């Protein structure tokens, strides 16, 4: 039966953690509504408090009805309900990806406030099949083709207990129990590649899906048993990440790793140093590997980073100028700037802005800057890296560059630590 299968999955995924409360993401579609009812049975059986989270993207006319339905259902089941709102700001560029990140940011931030460690989502077997086909079409490497029923976002564990359950079983469960759900009409639009793949798969014989599932399992086993342990060792042995937000890669040790791990290792560093959330495509990393194999010094850019070879070292630092970091007002004691640096305000100072060093600012204060430590650590690349570091300004005046201990008075009012907003399912431990 469906519940027994679900119970087996969720117990294997989180059964041993001794949690007292868990959150669940519910959209109103068949998948998440089925998950809500299954999780409710399991939570009550295990004396776990279940929190229902729903995000209104304000993109469809029926979204208000869906939120209202989910709230009423949660109330009927005796569960706490939280409605969140994603503001797309009338910007429809790359909307699916932005909405996905936006709702995960909203839900995991709420989980942190509620002291909830685990968020359940309704990704099912068909979703995994579609993802595999999409990534295969995009020529993803073996790491990109792999999947997991456990992920992380914003230090919240994302659990997918429906990973091996087809959508048809979920729909049948709802229909049999006379449970209402909503159909998202955007799932029928062929402007999204995923929908086109879904429609093609629907016309295929069952054995085609079974074959894809078999391929996915083999890839996952290869990652778990071979490449993931190698990647973790590779990071420990060959990578040095500086508090100044740059990294060095030992190319002698790098040459001894498998091709798959080399690609993932470069990607790992690009994400951390750039502050971006997504990894570079496999085909865009390959030219960098080709340059490395030629054993000649080079300087290139990729994924918001400068990649520079210096004999047997590869230096990676953030590219300055192409996409400048957003200036942020230091209203609270701490903030994260450029998705990479955590700035702490040690004293109650008003009108502080975290931003980047402009050429005009540099000309004014350059005679007062001591760059000797940064110069030594970066092997002479201090001038370029200086412009990637956060500074603090008050009324357009540079008052602090904490990394190089520059302050316009004797009070050390700000501290900075390199804390990139990055979590990888391949290297995250719990």
UniProtKB/Swiss-Prot annotation:
Originating organism: Rickettsia bellii (strain OSU 85-389)
Catalysed reactions, semicolon-separated: cytidine(34) in tRNA(Ile2) + L-lysine + ATP = lysidine(34) in tRNA(Ile2) + AMP + diphosphate + H(+)
Listed InterPro entries: Rossmann-like_a/b/a_fold, TilS/TtcA_N, tRNA_Ile_lys_synt, tRNA_Ile_lys_synt_N
GO biological process, one term: tRNA modification
Function: Ligates lysine onto the cytidine present at position 34 of the AUA codon-specific tRNA(Ile) that contains the anticodon CAU, in an ATP-dependent manner. Cytidine is converted to lysidine, thus changing the amino acid specificity of the tRNA from methionine to isoleucine.
Keyword entries, A-Z: ATP-binding, Cytoplasm, Ligase, Nucleotide-binding, tRNA processing
Subcellular localization, as worded in the UniProt entry: Cytoplasm
Major location category of this protein: cytoplasm
Record-stated family: Belongs to the tRNA(Ile)-lysidine synthase family.
GO cellular component terms, semicolon-separated: cytoplasm
Residues reported to bind ATP: 27-32
GO molecular function terms attached to this record: ATP binding; tRNA(Ile)-lysidine synthase activity
Protein EC: 6.3.4.19
Protein name: tRNA(Ile)-lysidine synthase
Record text about domains: The N-terminal region contains the highly conserved SGGXDS motif, predicted to be a P-loop motif involved in ATP binding.
Domain of life where this protein originates: Bacteria
Top enzyme category: ligase
């Amino acid at each position: 039966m469906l519940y027994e299968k679900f119970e087996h999955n969720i117990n294997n995924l989180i059964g041993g953690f001794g949690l007292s409360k868990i959150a669940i993401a519910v959209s109103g579609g068949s998948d998440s509504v089925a998950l809500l009812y299954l999780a409710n049975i399991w939570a009550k059986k295990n004396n776990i408090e279940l929190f229902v989270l729903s995000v209104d993207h304000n993109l469809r006319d029926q979204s208000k009805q869906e939120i209202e339905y989910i709230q009423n259902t949660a109330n009927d089941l005796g569960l706490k309900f939280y409605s969140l709102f994603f503001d797309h700001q009338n910007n429809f560029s790359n909307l699916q990806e932005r909405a996905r990140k936006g709702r995960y940011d909203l839900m995991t931030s709420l989980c942190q406030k509620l002291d909830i460690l685990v968020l359940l989502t309704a990704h099912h077997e068909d979703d995994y099949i579609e993802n595999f086909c999409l990534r295969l079409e995009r020529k993803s490497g073996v790491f990109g083709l792999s999947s997991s029923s456990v992920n992380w976002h914003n230090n919240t564990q994302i659990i997918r207990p429906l990973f091996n359950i087809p959508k048809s079983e979920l729909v049948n469960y709802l229909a049999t129990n006379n449970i209402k759900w909503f159909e998202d009409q955007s799932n029928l639009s062929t402007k999204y590649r995923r929908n086109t793949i879904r429609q093609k798969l629907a016309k295929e014989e069952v054995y085609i899906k079974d074959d894809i599932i078999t391929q996915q399992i083999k890839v996952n086993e290869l990652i778990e048993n071979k490449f993931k342990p190698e990647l973790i060792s590779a990071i420990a042995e060959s990578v040095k990440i500086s508090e100044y937000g740059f990294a060095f890669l030992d190319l002698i040790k790098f040459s001894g790793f498998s091709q798959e791990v080399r690609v993932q290792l470069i990607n790992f560093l690009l994400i951390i140093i750039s502050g971006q959330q997504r990894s570079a495509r496999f085909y865009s990393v390959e030219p960098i590997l080709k340059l490395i194999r030629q054993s000649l010094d080079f300087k290139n850019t990729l994924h918001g980073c400068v990649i520079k070879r210096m004999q047997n070292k590869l230096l990676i630092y953030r590219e300055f100028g192409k996409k400048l970091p957003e200036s942020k007002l230091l209203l609270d004691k701490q903030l994260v700037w450029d998705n990479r640096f955590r700035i702490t305000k040690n004293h109650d100072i008003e009108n502080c802005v975290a931003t980047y060093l402009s050429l005009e600012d540099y000309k004014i204060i350059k005679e007062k800057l001591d760059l000797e430590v940064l110069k030594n650590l970066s092997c002479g690349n201090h001038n370029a890296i200086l412009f990637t570091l956060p500074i603090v300004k008050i009324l357009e005046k540079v008052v602090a560059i904490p990394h190089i201990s520059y302050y316009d008075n004797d009070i050390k009012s700000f501290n900075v630590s390199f804390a990139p907003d990055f979590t990888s399912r391949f290297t995250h431990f719990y």
